[in-house]
Design a protein with these regions (language model features):
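Alpha-helical transmembrane segments of bacterial inner-membrane membrane proteins
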Residues: 1-220
Length: 220
């Protein structure tokens, strides 16, 4: 309108700041949305960010039983119909620093998952390395580990070959070396090592505290 045009000419500096702020805000919204990842068309796709897993659960206390067996299903009074056709993949866990996007600080010692490599072969995509990289033998007796690429870059602020210092279950110094990085996965915020290495270095961390499940999400 004529009033708006007159106001722009009267206080051009203030008007320029207002228009610039609105333009910057619109740019931030659009640019942030460009990085948004769409969910996979099928969560059962082994190469998607879910690795073909439909659910990720945690336990407040260690579980020592195989949740795929009838004995464990009866012991914990689990719903058999929901677990029909599903497979439960257990993970050992050693707690550590928060390495998620909620932590703006450098994660020096992220939590560690101990996994059975055979349960993960063929799942997820890698920016570098693969699950077989966990069988490498780094110099100095370091333990090989895999981590999500985004966690490695932004939370840990290091690259492939970087090392982190821990203390094992017996109080001895322990080095863990990053030997590979997953690409765009849900496995962010933690390191993943072989179960054999986990049991060797963290004997006191008995049982399983985290579980990945395959199956149809519509049956939940």
């Amino acid at each position: 309108s004529q009033l708006n045009r007159r106001n722009l000419g009267r206080r051009a500096g203030r008007s320029l700041v207002t228009v610039g702020s609105m333009a910057a805000g619109a740019f931030l919204v659009v640019s942030t949305g460009a990085f948004r990842k769409a969910p996979p068309a099928s969560p059962t796709d082994l190469k998607s960010g879910t690795g073909g897993f439909s659910f990720w659960g945690e336990s407040a206390v260690p579980i020592y039983d195989d949740l795929n067996q009838d004995e464990a299903i009866s012991l914990f009074d689990l719903n058999r119909s929901l677990l029909l056709g599903a497979n439960v993949v257990p993970l050992r866990l050693r707690e550590g620093d928060d390495a998620s996007c909620l932590n703006l600080n450098n994660a020096l010692r992220p939590k560690i998952f101990g996994i059975k490599v055979s349960d993960f072969e063929g799942r997820f995509e890698f920016a570098e390395g693969n699950w077989s990289s966990l069988y490498q033998k780094p110099d100095g007796g370091a333990i090989p580990a895999l981590v999500d690429q985004n966690t490695l870059m932004w939370a840990m602020k290091m690259g492939i070959g970087g090392r982190l210092n821990y203390v094992d279950g017996e109080g001895n110094p322990l080095e863990i070396e990053v030997v590979g990085a997953l690409k765009g996965s849900m496995l962010q915020g933690a390191l993943f090592i072989k179960e054999e290495d986990f049991l060797d270095k963290f004997k006191q961390q008995g049982g399983y505290l985290s579980f990945l499940l395959t199956g149809d999400k519509d049956d939940a």
